[in-house]
Design a protein with these regions (language model features):
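Extended, charged alpha/beta regions that create polyanion-binding interfaces
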Residues: 1-9
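Short glycine-rich or small-residue beta-strand-to-loop segments that form or flank ligand, phosphate
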Residues: 10-20, 52-56
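Glycine-rich phosphate-binding loop
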Residues: 66-117
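Conserved small/polar residues in nucleotide/adenosyl-binding loops
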Residues: 197-202
Length: 208
């Protein structure tokens, strides 16, 4: 509905994340691999002009990503912003297997406790569609998933069934917090990443 009713429209694709960190490079990789055409859309009679931006992370720029995006949006005046980012999973099975879609924007870094200003319509001034893919999982989640499988296994045993019953009374959140408390401090904030395969971009293939 954002661009369907317009004869011509501009879309800004925002690739969030650190291109130098494999599991956080999803956003920049998407921008690298999409067809950017805004610079010749008018001459070519293209209906939807696509621009791309990979602003990096605050540690690289010293600026909030939202500040950079707001400045670009003010100049570019896109009809809609599509933000792509890596997410932290709360279930190991979701790594690289699920996609989260939202029309409410996105808050970079929130999945790993690194809270930054959100990329939302209220902040940047245009509608924001967010696409997220889980690419990292923390150590407590891996331990929790392992424990869940272990408890399912011992539930089949008459002698150990009572142990499984005790833990079944805990909610998933309570189990996760319990594991965070007993796991070593060095492991609590450790994240495991998935390798993302990156194919040559259209621009690389054209040699430009």
């Amino acid at each position: 509905g954002y661009i369907r009713e317009k004869e011509k429209a501009t879309v800004l694709v925002l690739g969030l994340g650190n291109a130098d960190v494999t599991a956080d490079a999803l956003g920049p990789d998407v921008v690298k691999n999409i067809e950017i055409n805004r610079h010749y859309a008018k001459e070519a009679g293209i209906q939807v002009a696509v621009a791309g931006l990979a602003p990096g992370v605050m540690a690289q720029t010293g600026m909030e990503t939202a500040e950079l995006v707001r400045g670009v949006v003010r100049q570019l005046k896109p009809d809609v912003l599509i933000a792509i980012d890596s997410l932290a999973a709360r279930d190991s099975s979701r790594l690289n297997t699920t996609i989260q879609l939202s029309s409410q924007g996105i808050h970079p870094g929130s999945g790993v406790g690194n809270h930054r200003v959100g990329i939302t319509e209220d902040v940047v001034g245009v509608p924001v569609l967010a696409i997220g893919v889980p690419t990292v999982v923390d150590a407590p989640t891996i331990v929790n998933d392992t424990m869940e499988n272990f408890l399912k296994a011992i539930a089949q045993s008459k002698e150990l069934k009572s142990v499984s019953r005790i833990f079944s009374e805990y909610s998933p959140r309570e189990k996760y917090e319990l594991i965070r408390e007993v796991i070593s401090p060095e492991m609590v904030n450790m994240y495991v990443t998935c390798l993302l395969y990156t194919s040559p971009s259209p621009r690389d293939q054209r040699g430009s």
